[in-house]
Amino acid sequence: MTQDKILILDFGSQVTRLIARRVREAHVYCELHSFDMPLDEIKAFNPKGIILSGGPNSVYESDYQADTGIFDLGIPVLGICYGMQFMAHHLGGEVQPGNQREFGYAQVKTIDSGLTRGIQDDAPNTLDVWMSHGDKVSKLPDGFAVIGDTPSCPIAMMENTEKQFYGIQFHPEVTHTKQGRALLNRFVLDICGAQPGWTMPNYIEEAVAKIREQVGSDEVILGLSGGVDSSVAAALIHRAIGDQLTCVFVDHGLLRLNEGKMVMDMFARNLGVKVIHVDAEGQFMAKLAGVTDPEKKRKIIGAEFIEVFDAEEKKLTNAKWLAQGTIYPDVIESAGAKTKKAHAIKSHHNVGGLPENMKLKLLEPLRDLFKDEVRELGVALGLPREMVYRHPFPGPGLGVRILGEVKKEYADLLRQADDIFIQELRNTTDENGTSWYDLTSQAFAVFLPVKSVGVMGDGRTYDYVVALRAVITSDFMTAHWAELPYSLLGRVSNRIINEVKGINRVVYDVSGKPPATIEWE
């Protein structure tokens, strides 16, 4: 089936892939390519329109230039943040450093235009947006008009109606920009005229064919954690190659309470996949002893996983591939985007935590999907809701939820505290009868390797502290902390302190992403 397509040129923003997610939400197929994609390849791709992403650099840096021939293709172009500056700079306008960096919420005053007509927030002709820029356009190119401004950014939006070129100095792809989807839909559906035809069933068909082509008759090992990503990856790969897939469930001593039994029962009942259960707690704990640096912990856990998989591979006659449930937020936070320009934040177990001498080839069928797309894919593959809508769990498990050195004692305490938190979230509902577990996107406890003084009965205690973390997000690239009811937090705190011997204080994390990441390590 021939589909209308949008091309996104990536200049290295941490949130570039959210643009692709928003376009896909409109059921329009899109691909994200490096900013230096050759013009002949762009022509061959034959997009209905082009979106230029944001990025951390200046238009005056020669290493970050796209082929300006894109402005001669006769198709609409939308520049976002750096993309707007690139457009202005190369079409005869001027870009200069701002007097102050603008980061966070801003209100843009708009005028009626092809891009903004009928789109506004609470006040007439205003948009509540998310800014993140230093440089700004100071002079318009010929043929352009200002269609939006802020007090510190007089040219916050611009357009050339004749050529259908548009520039916006904010990020419509992040959820903080309330009308961001509406603006992107206006560009993609109305201005570009793209017809919606991209659906998850179509994606499954293409992904299954690609997996079969990649793998051939080889056998595949998948590291099964029981989380959403590895579960959906297993279902998709099993759909493609059946019994060529063997799942390896590694109990590294850093799992949630009773997780081993739950995972084995769930997959035996729901997927019919071959699953090997490996008890490797002693091996992992020995390697992690004395290690406090989070990056080193991730690398060690990744390396030990490979050791386990290598051992299992020797038992299979034709194993050539290691499958993982890597999704795009894992990749972007490790600066693993195709441009290699995004600023690195931390390595991920599924990306930068793997050793270079790995003996198996990597199969990552979910690598370009966002979390909500992965869930949608899981439902389309026939997985039960209890599996698909389970909160994410990191590959290194509790190893990155125990700050500092990992010890069995700490893991046992954290497991109990985390289970109490999740129980109470499941058992508490809002006024509409929806559980707080379903209302939050991810929730967990974090073990802090510090002790605090407390009083229980008539005695003094000196025990450990746990932090509770709950966030709400649609894409895991940005997130708000969940405003849980005080009564719920109080019950969780009371239960943990009374039921988990060794913990006497509970705190709640009220940090958003950005500036914090969702996990503490």
From Swiss-Prot:
Active-site residues annotated for this sequence: 81, 171, 173
EC number: 6.3.5.2
InterPro entries membership: Class_I_gatase-like, GATASE, GMP_synth_C, GMP_synth_GATase, GMP_synthase, GMPS_ATP_PPase_dom, NAD/GMP_synthase, Rossmann-like_a/b/a_fold
Domain GMPS ATP-PPase: residue ranges: 198-390
Described purpose of this protein according to its UniProt entry: Catalyzes the synthesis of GMP from XMP.
Reaction equations catalysed: XMP + L-glutamine + ATP + H2O = GMP + L-glutamate + AMP + diphosphate + 2 H(+)
Record-annotated Glutamine amidotransferase type-1 domain positions: 5-197
Residue runs in coiled coils: none
Name the UniProt record assigns to this protein: GMP synthase [glutamine-hydrolyzing]
Residues holding ATP: 225-231
One Gene Ontology molecular-function label: GMP synthase activity
Keywords noted in UniProt: ATP-binding, Glutamine amidotransferase, GMP biosynthesis, Ligase, Nucleotide-binding, Purine biosynthesis
Gene (UniProt): guaA
Pathway the protein contributes to: Purine metabolism; GMP biosynthesis; GMP from XMP (L-Gln route): step 1/1
Gene Ontology terms: cellular component: cytosol
Assembly with partners or alone: Homodimer.
Keyword Ligase: yes
